[in-house]
C-alpha cells in the first residue's frame, strides 16, 4: 500500500515538473515604436522574444524524450531561432529565442502574438494575446502528455525603443531602476 502511494506521488511530482515547464519563468519581448506604427498600418511585423522555462527534478531519458517532442511541436507552431537546455540548481533550464507577430489583427493565427489596439484617440494598448492556433497547440501538448498544457499568460518584460514617445505603463525599468506608477 505504501509503495503504491509512493509511486503515485513520484508520478504526480514528475508530471508537475513538466507542467511547470509550460509557463515561462520569464518572457522578454523586444519592439520599437517603428514596429508598432508598421503593425497599425497593417504591415506584417515579427518581433524578437526570449523565453526561459524551468523544469524541476532530474532531466532523465523520459523527460528528455518529452522535451524533444515539445521542441518539434514548438518549431511547428512558433518561429524559433535558438533552443538551449542548461543544467540549473534545481533541474533543467530551457531557453527559447525566436520571433512572434506584432499585429493589429484580432484574428491572428499564431498561438501567441503581440496585439496593438487603439486605447483612445492618442494611445494604443500593446499586449500579449493568444491566437486561433493556441487551442491546437494545447491539444497537441496534451497528446504528448495528458498533464501538459500551454499557458496563455506569462510574466512579460517588454524592451521598447521609442525615443521621444509617450508611454503609459504600470511599472517600468529605466536604466536598471524600477519605477512603479
What are these regions (language model features)?
Residues 44-73, 136-148, 152:
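Post-signal-peptide N-terminal segment of Sec-exported extracytoplasmic proteins
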Residues 72-181:
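Mature, soluble, non-transmembrane domains
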Residues 30-51:
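Post-signal peptide N-terminal segment of mature Sec-exported envelope proteins
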Residues 1-10:
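Bacterial N-terminal signal peptides that target proteins for export
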Residues 20-21:
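C-terminal motif of bacterial Sec signal peptides marking the signal peptidase cleavage site
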Residues 24-35, 58-74, 78-80:
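Short N-terminal edge-element motif at the start of the domain
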Amino acid at each position: 500500500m505504501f509503495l503504491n502511494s509512493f509511486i503515485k506521488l513520484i508520478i504526480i511530482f514528475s508530471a508537475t515538473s513538466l507542467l511547470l515547464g509550460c509557463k515561462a519563468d520569464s518572457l522578454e519581448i523586444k519592439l520599437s515604436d517603428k514596429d508598432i506604427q508598421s503593425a497599425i498600418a497593417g504591415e506584417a511585423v515579427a518581433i524578437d522574444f526570449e523565453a526561459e522555462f524551468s523544469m524541476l527534478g532530474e532531466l532523465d531519458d523520459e523527460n528528455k524524450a518529452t522535451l524533444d517532442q515539445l521542441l518539434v511541436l514548438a518549431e511547428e507552431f512558433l518561429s524559433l531561432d535558438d533552443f538551449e537546455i542548461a543544467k540549473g540548481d534545481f533541474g533543467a533550464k530551457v531557453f527559447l529565442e525566436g520571433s512572434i507577430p506584432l499585429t493589429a489583427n484580432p484574428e491572428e493565427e499564431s498561438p501567441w502574438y503581440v496585439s496593438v489596439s487603439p486605447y483612445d484617440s492618442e494611445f494604443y494598448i500593446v499586449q500579449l494575446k493568444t491566437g486561433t492556433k493556441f487551442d491546437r497547440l494545447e491539444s497537441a501538448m496534451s497528446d504528448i502528455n495528458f498533464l501538459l498544457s500551454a499557458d496563455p499568460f506569462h510574466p512579460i518584460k517588454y524592451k521598447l525603443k521609442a525615443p521621444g514617445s509617450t508611454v503609459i505603463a504600470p511599472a517600468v525599468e529605466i536604466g536598471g531602476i524600477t519605477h512603479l506608477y
